[in-house]
A protein has these predicted regions:
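Hinge/cleft segment of the Venus flytrap/periplasmic-binding protein
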Residues: 6-10, 168-169, 180-182, 187, ...
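Extracytoplasmic "Venus flytrap"
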Residues: 35-52, 56, 65-84, 88, ...
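Short, solvent-exposed amphipathic alpha-helices that sit
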Residues: 45-62, 140-144, 168-188, 203-207, ...
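Short beta-strand elements in bilobed, periplasmic/extracellular small-molecule ligand-binding domains
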Residues: 57-71, 158-160, 183-200
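Hydrophobic alpha-helical segments within soluble ligand-binding/sensing domains
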Residues: 78, 133-158, 172, 202-205, ...
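Hydrophobic alpha-helical
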Residues: 86, 94-111, 177, 197-259
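Flexible loop/hinge segments that line or gate small-molecule binding clefts
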Residues: 100-139, 157, 163, 254-262, ...
């Protein structure tokens, strides 16, 4: 009788351990996590990346940990977030490096820890990552230069509202812009170029206003990202004349900038696809974890849009996650 009781107790214990094991296995599967770290969290541009990442996570049953610094120049904070996610043993990291040099050790640490890292939006000076998914930013700068060259008929004085140095994406845009003007439109002169410090829309407004005040007879302006485009547009409105309008080309889709394009307050915008960066970045990590091949570099596309293309279904789809 006693033996029968002990056999029963033993069987119950084994069943309990098996059940706990199954629960733990289920918990592990449910807790698959991918960290997504933008350059900053204040710009609406990064909302597109977040939405794309969340959609991919939902489809693959992965949790998305979204965290980033409040402003893009806070490299130390971004590095700390990468370190924290490594300690959390996330399954992978999607990272938009705020500085192509400063983030190198953090990216290489993910590689050393065998945590797949997909770099999005902006490059980093190492190859110790799974994949790089971004706009061809040099091409974006080329498109902006060609547009401003066209609307100014190859002659005039222009301003450039630049961005924080060592941001690989904006550095490439500005390089493409300047080199294309020099080669294809030698009659156009960049008479002034400044970047906002700190990198806020208010400061972008101030530096644009200062340049417009210092330089008379300006014909055009290029703002190289969403923050500078928003600040430049608000400053520009106070300097426009009915008989001579300063032609502005912006980059990225801030709601007020898209509204300005619709009203004719600026000439055109260069658009990226941040949703695709977030979506494909997460998907690439999951494919890698399944043993599938992942391309080392992916071009996520770039578009020039003018007022007449704003309501094109393709453009509206592109804007949906950004405004």
């Amino acid at each position: 009788m006693k033996n029968a009781i002990w056999v029963t107790v033993f069987a119950v214990l084994i069943a309990a351990f098996v059940a706990v094991g199954l629960l733990r296995k289920g918990d592990t599967k449910a807790s698959h996590q991918i960290g997504v770290i933008p350059k900053e969290t204040e710009s609406v541009y990064w909302e597109g990346v977040r939405q794309g990442a969340l959609k991919a996570g939902e489809e693959e049953k992965y949790s998305i940990l979204w965290n980033g610094p409040e402003i893009e120049t806070d490299c130390e904070r971004q590095i700390q977030i990468v370190e924290d996610m490594i300690l959390q043993k996330v399954d992978g990291i999607v990272l938009a490096p705020s500085n192509r040099k400063a983030l190198v050790p953090a990216v290489e640490k993910t590689y050393a820890q065998k945590i797949p890292c997909v770099i999005v939006d902006s490059g980093v000076e190492t190859d110790k990552y799974l994949s790089y998914m971004a706009t061809d930013n040099y091409k974006g700068g080329v498109l902006a230069a060609q547009r401003i060259g066209e609307v100014l008929a190859g002659k005039g004085k222009i301003l450039v509202v630049a961005w924080t140095p060592n941001s690989a994406s904006t550095d490439a845009r500005l390089q493409g812009f300047r080199e294309t003007l020099a080669k294809e439109f030698p009659g156009i002169e960049i008479v002034d170029s400044q970047f906002p410090n700190p990198p806020t829309m208010d400061k972008a407004h101030d530096v644009t206003q200062d340049m417009l005040t210092r330089n008379t007879g300006v014909d055009g302006l290029f703002a190289c990202n969403a923050t500078t485009a928003g600040g430049a547009l608000t400053a520009l409105r106070g300097f426009q004349k009915s008989d001579k309008k300063i032609k502005m080309v912006g980059f990225d889709a801030w709601p007020m900038v898209v509204d300005g394009l619709e009203k004719g307050d600026l000439d055109s915008l260069i658009l990226q696809n941040p949703y695709k960066m977030g979506y494909e970045g997460v998907k690439a990590i999951i494919r890698h974890l399944k043993g599938e091949k992942v391309d080392k570099q992916v071009d996520t596309g770039v578009e020039l849009i003018t007022q007449d293309r704003l309501h094109d279904p393709k453009i509206q789809e592109l804007l949906k996650s950004q405004i």
